[in-house]
Curated annotation (Swiss-Prot):
Keywords: FAD, Flavoprotein, Glycoprotein, Monooxygenase, Oxidoreductase, Signal
Organism: Neosartorya fischeri (strain ATCC 1020 / DSM 3700 / CBS 544.65 / FGSC A1164 / JCM 1740 / NRRL 181 / WB 181) (Aspergillus fischerianus)
SUPFAM superfamilies noted in UniProt: FAD/NAD(P)-binding domain
MF terms in GO: FAD binding; monooxygenase activity
Family: Belongs to the paxM FAD-dependent monooxygenase family.
Keyword Ribonucleoprotein: no
PANTHER family: FAD-DEPENDENT MONOOXYGENASE APTC, MONOOXYGENASE, FAD-BINDING
Pfam family, one: FAD_binding_3
Top enzyme class: oxidoreductase
Protein name: FAD-dependent monooxygenase nscC
Function: FAD-dependent monooxygenase; part of the gene cluster that mediates the biosynthesis of neosartoricin, a prenylated anthracenone that exhibits T-cell antiproliferative activity, suggestive of a physiological role as an immunosuppressive agent. The non-reducing polyketide synthase nscA probably synthesizes and cyclizes the decaketide backbone. The hydrolase nscB then mediates the product release through hydrolysis followed by spontaneous decarboxylation. The prenyltransferase nscD catalyzes the addition of the dimethylallyl group to the aromatic C5.
Higher taxonomy: Eukaryota, Fungi, Dikarya, Ascomycota, Pezizomycotina
Needed cofactors: FAD
Keyword Glycosyltransferase assigned: no
Length: 408
């Protein structure tokens, strides 16, 4: 008797690896294909909300939260737990605007996770090693549920029961199966920088503001400048910063709103960014690192802010083709104000559970059940994330009004 066809997972990000790990733990054959090399760098940190990480820990056998934070927290090497205080600071005065009520019954616990470390941790949460094949960039996907075929640019060809599209906002699977679904560009400016500094300098410049928190959330008059710890050791701290704001007007006359930049151009620092940072009159520590001279020594990227939305009819079409979408491939959200990583975890957990329940019966019904559960959750989140992006970039007068209602 021929062995069962595997489930083919395109993309080794958070959603793809979560799906693969849980399928593997359930004894369901699967292969993960990743376009990049094993040493790809994506070491920035993301925020995991309680509902997101609790879902994952439960699916992995009710693991304790400490198991996760020991493996993924940016400050794990010095015994930290990825804690953030959720405080909001005025980046023009270096004064704290407000802190969410720590005693509130509605305050959700949030932990920071280094993205590279999170992928490794998920992959390692089981006795059987995952089958991840790097250097496989998808060329085409054909067939239907029960017998799908995928071909890669390196000439490799595979057949499987179904395809899990975990290939991100610019999903190749989606472009072939749901060609009419295109990412929506949010009219926003977002620059991201990475730098490293000695631990002693971090303790001197940042600790007076952050304490043990892994984020220093600075806001200005319609713009944001958060600092975040990506990885911390006893001697050095790898950090990142972001500079973000809504585009001016339609964006046509905004020198920093450039949503269609080529990848190499997106790594260059435009003079307009240097000029704009200089005009912001930032207080320390923001002014020490967000200036024209300092950022020349940082790895700086321009990030286009994109969203992806789908209809229930789109998902029904995908079921017939044997495609299950997870993560940003079907619900990309703005980096600021979004909860994409949390929904990626939830997708992987819910899809793996649905497939495990239906693989011996009607797999189409199983995928349909997954979409029925996940569609509203994720698509509502896409809509909320766009609204939250603008709320997080409000005028300073509104921030100060909020601070009167939520005093420090």
């Amino acid at each position: 008797m021929a062995p069962p066809l595997p489930i083919l997972i395109i993309g080794a990000g958070i959603s793809g690896l979560t799906t693969a790990r849980l399928l593997t733990n359930s004894g369901i054959p699967n292969i993960v294909f990743e376009a990049s090399s094993p040493d790809r760098r994506q070491g920035f940190a993301i925020s995991l909300r309680e509902w997101g990480y609790a879902t994952l820990l439960s699916a992995l056998g009710d693991l304790p939260l400490r198991s996760l934070t020991r493996g993924v927290a940016p400050d794990r090497e010095i015994g930290g737990s990825g804690w953030i205080d959720q405080a909001v600071w005025d980046n023009g005065t270096a004064k704290k605007l407000f802190v969410p009520d720590a005693n509130s019954s509605t305050k959700e616990q949030i932990v920071r996770a280094n993205r590279n470390a999170l992928r490794r941790w998920i992959a390692d949460c089981g006795e059987e090693e995952l089958d991840v094949r790097y250097g496989h960039r998808l060329k085409r996907v054909e067939g239907s549920l029960g017998d799908v075929q995928v071909e890669f640019e390196n000439g490799a060809f595979y057949r499987g029961l179904m395809v899990v599209a975990a290939d991100g906002v610019n999903s190749t699977v989606r472009s072939q199966v749901l060609a009419d679904v295109q990412p929506e560009i949010v009219p926003a400016v977002l620059y991201h920088g990475e730098f490293q500094l000695p631990r002693a300098d971090f303790d001197r410049l940042f600790r007076p503001h952050t304490g043990e928190s892994n984020i220093l959330a600075g806001v200005g008059d319609g713009f944001n400048t958060p600092f975040a710890v990506c990885n911390m050791t006893k001697t050095h701290v790898h950090m990142d910063w972001s500079y973000s704001r809504p585009a001016w007007g339609s964006g046509e006359n905004d020198p920093l709103y450039r949503p269609n930049l080529a990848s190499e151009e997106a790594k260059r620092i435009p003079p307009a960014l240097v000029e704009e940072l200089a005009s912001r009159d930032l207080a320390e520590p923001w002014s020490l690192f967000l200036n024209g001279e300092a950022i020349q020594h940082h790895r700086v990227f321009h990030w286009a802010v994109r969203c992806v939305s789908v209809t229930q009819e789109d998902m029904q079409r995908a079921v017939g083709r044997g495609i299950a979408f997870v993560g940003d491939s079907w619900h990309a959200m703005p980096i600021f104000g979004g909860e994409g990583g949390n929904h990626a975890l939830a997708d992987g957990v819910e899809l793996a559970a649905a497939v495990a329940a239906g693989v011996a019966g009607d797999l189409g019904v199983a995928i349909g059940n997954y979409y029925d559960r996940a569609w509203k959750r994720s698509q509502d989140a896409v809509r909320r994330s766009k609204q939250r992006f603008y709320a997080l970039h409000r005028p300073m007068a509104q921030w100060r009004e909020l601070s009167q209602k939520k005093p420090v």
